[in-house]
């Protein structure tokens, strides 16, 4: 007899992941990402293309925010930020790789790549806030 949990759980998980992705869109993701995901209408390959394009955009934003933040802080803080950023990249990659479950099918792939997009977006915003706070202090 088939385990209904194996069928229902991935569907619920995907719905949750896409709801979370949509809420993240309202914060710092590009308007193009919102439009792309709406147009994807739940088609996995289209969603993956949207996520990939947004991840590239957010990765460029992250690199820019990182450079700008480094330029705005003291030499001592720069060394600490470099260490923190290296460790953060390792954490992001390990965390998102954890979501890639070969038994999870396309759902696991969507979750893994969207994890990278979300974490990259959040880190870019965090670095911008840190830089702004440093200017005020």
What residue spans do the PLM features occupy?
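N-terminal alpha-helical modules
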Residues: 2, 22-137
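Bacterial N-terminal signal peptides
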Residues: 8-20
């Amino acid at each position: 007899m088939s385990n209904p949990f194996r069928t229902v759980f991935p569907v619920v998980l995907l719905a949750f992941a896409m709801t979370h992705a949509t809420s993240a869109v309202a914060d710092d993701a590009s308007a193009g990402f919102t439009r792309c995901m709406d147009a994807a209408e739940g088609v996995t390959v289209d969603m993956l293309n949207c996520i990939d394009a947004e991840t590239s955009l957010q990765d460029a934003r992250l690199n820019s925010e990182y450079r700008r933040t480094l330029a705005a802080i003291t030499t001592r803080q720069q060394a600490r930020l470099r260490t923190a950023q290296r460790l953060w990249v390792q954490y992001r990659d390990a965390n998102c790789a954890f979501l890639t479950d070969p038994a999870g099918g396309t759902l696991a792939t969507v979750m893994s790549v969207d994890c990278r997009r979300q974490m990259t977006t959040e880190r870019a915003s965090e670095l911008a806030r840190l830089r702004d706070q440093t200017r005020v202090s």
